[in-house]
């Protein structure tokens, strides 16, 4: 599945969670990279929500951390046909349903010179 979406600013909460060893170690082990402490937030058209929710609900990749932190489902993905990473689906989130959170080893706004409003493609 390949979806075009719009880059937007998040709430900055992912930086804290992606700095926790149990998340970092699991992503490194299962995805092959140590994630940059933050996500690239992408708003996708609502017409894709049924397919995204199906992928999320059927996803078997899950990190269940220590008490006090929420579980995270993830699926390997690519951004703009060039960056390998993953889309994360945190059990606890404040984002709307049509937000995808993409993680990678690099700060993608810098690496790809992205700004709010830019269009990106996400494939998973």
Swiss-Prot record:
Pathway: Cofactor biosynthesis; FMN biosynthesis; FMN from riboflavin (CTP route): step 1/1. It holds the Pfam family CTP-dep_RFKase. CDP binds at residues 10-15, 106-109. It catalyses: riboflavin + CTP = CDP + FMN + H(+). It comes from the Archaea. Its cofactor is Mg(2+). FMN binds at residues 93, 101. It is an enzyme of class 2 (transferase). Binds 1 Mg(2+) ion per subunit. Mg(2+) binds at residues 39, 41. GO terms for biological process: FMN biosynthetic process; riboflavin biosynthetic process. Its EC number is 2.7.1.161. GO terms for molecular function: magnesium ion binding; nucleotide binding; riboflavin kinase activity. Belongs to the archaeal riboflavin kinase family. Catalyzes the CTP-dependent phosphorylation of riboflavin (vitamin B2) to form flavin mononucleotide (FMN). HAMAP family: Riboflavin_kinase (MF_01285). This is Riboflavin kinase. It comes from Methanobrevibacter smithii (strain ATCC 35061 / DSM 861 / OCM 144 / PS). The lineage of its organism: Archaea, Methanobacteriati, Methanobacteriota, Methanomada group, Methanobacteria. The gene is ribK.
